[in-house]
A protein has these predicted regions:
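N-terminal active-site segment of His-dependent metallophosphoesterases
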Residues: 36-127
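His/acidic metal-ligating clusters that form di-metal
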Residues: 81-97, 103-107, 149-150, 205, ...
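N-terminal export leaders
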Residues: 13-27
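Short, solvent-exposed loop/turn elements at domain surfaces
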Residues: 43, 51-57, 228-229, 264, ...
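Short, flexible/disordered intra-domain loops and linkers
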Residues: 56-68, 123-132, 167-174, 266-287
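Extended active-site neighborhood of metal-dependent phosphoesterases/phosphodiesterases
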Residues: 119-247, 278, 294-300, 317-349, ...
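Active-site neighborhood of phospho(di)ester-bond hydrolases with catalytic His/Asp-centered motifs
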Residues: 46-47, 111-116, 155-159, 255-258, ...
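N-terminal secretory signal peptides
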Residues: 1-13
């Protein structure tokens, strides 16, 4: 894989355990308000829900791929049950070494979605019945009560499957508009309307937004920071100003988007194989090296302690690009999630997967970095 900014780890770090060595810790520089800096922030990240309802049934191939409502309900039960579980002490027989190992996880601040809330924005079909997919998503991944809804606020994010669908002419934009309207309805403040999950800073041009949980600044970038596909407006000028305004003086920052720096997200056309893969040297499939570097340049100088992303469905990953740590759970319809906590200048992340119908989970990866 070509170098983008420093070195990029080609493959996910061990499925068992990754612990950042003390010499590689990224320092979380102290906040001016020590009390706020010591506040604990716990949150969940998910991606690739792929709500697949089509009218009264499912979109083609969704049943075979496991993109079913039953699997989403199993996922939601696992997310809701996490607050009653404990940070893992052992994964696959190996000690995690987490400083918070064995401690109760507690109630998370919210669930952040890293794109592909729906399935059929990726160009599969162009039917009005697709509108039931965002309806299905909203009935499941919205704060509510009972076993069939998430019990904490949900911060929505859009991926290629939400943004790439062209409707039949002349209504080519209807699907994208519907998904962007969902983000605005849920997160954009206005004089006339208070959204269910308000963002502190919402960019009306790109629909990217940011908010704070105590000592942590969080930013939703949808497909990726700087996306201009299908008429999108680049969020990079807004992001630069947002970080300067809200994350100065070393405040820790976490970014969320759909694409990452993993081999699938960075694959290119391979003419010898007539396909996109991670050994090709032709046209990039998802985003270009220039777009990747532009995002990295924009966040240079900010204390970005992690980027969470989705897009690839099957492999949990903890890896680096340059000096940035990246975290990618498996797809939500396969039960995947990331659980993160910032406490006392220590950042912990575990990846996991729902494995039964009763809220059970299996943790697959663990990561922690500390500061002085």
């Amino acid at each position: 894989m070509p170098d983008r900014s420093g070195s990029t780890t080609r493959f996910p770090i061990s499925r068992r355990v990754f612990m950042a060595g003390s010499g590689a810790f990224l320092l979380l520089r102290p906040s001016s308000a020590s009390r706020a800096a010591d506040e604990k922030v716990t949150f969940i990240f998910i991606a690739d829900v792929h709500a697949c309802r089509m009218g009264a049934g499912l979109s083609p191939n969704c049943q075979q791929e496991g993109k079913t409502d039953a699997n989403l309900l199993r996922h939601i039960r696992a997310l809701n049950d996490l607050e009653y579980k404990h940070w893992p002490e052992v994964i696959d027989g190996n000690p995690t070494g987490l400083a918070n190992a064995g401690k109760l996880i507690g109630r998370p601040r919210g669930v952040v979605v890293g794109g592909d809330m729906t399935d059929d924005g990726g160009g599969q079909t162009a039917e009005r019945d697709e509108g039931t997919q965002i309806l299905q998503f909203s009935h499941r991944y919205r704060e509510g009560t009972g076993p069939d809804m998430v019990h904490v606020p949900v911060y929505s994010g859009l991926g290629n499957h939400d943004l790439d669908q062209d409707g039949r002419p002349p209504d080519t934009e209807w699907y994208r508009d519907e998904l962007r309207d969902y983000v605005r309805f849920n997160h954009e403040n206005s004089v006339f309307f208070k959204p269910p999950v308000p963002a502190a800073n919402f960019d009306p041009l790109s629909d990217c937004y940011s908010w704070d949980w105590g000592p942590l600044h969080l930013v939703q970038l949808h497909r990726f920071g700087g996306d201009t596909r299908k008429g999108a407006v680049s969020a990079l000028p807004w992001l630069k100003q947002d970080l300067a305004t809200n994350a100065a003086n070393g405040k820790p920052v976490v970014l969320f988007q759909h694409y990452g720096w993993d081999p699938f997200s960075t694959e290119r056309w391979d003419p010898a194989k007539s396909t996109f893969d991670d050994t090709g040297h032709g046209k990039p499939h998802w985003w270009t090296q220039q777009e990747q570097q532009a995002l990295l340049d924009t966040i240079t100088g900010a204390n970005v302690i992690g980027i969470f992303h989705g897009h690839e469905h099957d492999t949990p990953m903890i890896y680096r690009t340059g000096n940035i740590d990246l975290f990618k759970p498996i797809a939500s319809f396969k039960g995947g999630f990331a659980l993160a906590e910032l406490e006392a200048k220590r950042f912990s992340v575990v990846l996991g997967q729902a494995f039964d119908e009763f809220g059970g989970v299996k943790f697959t990866n663990a990561f922690q970095k500390a500061s002085s």
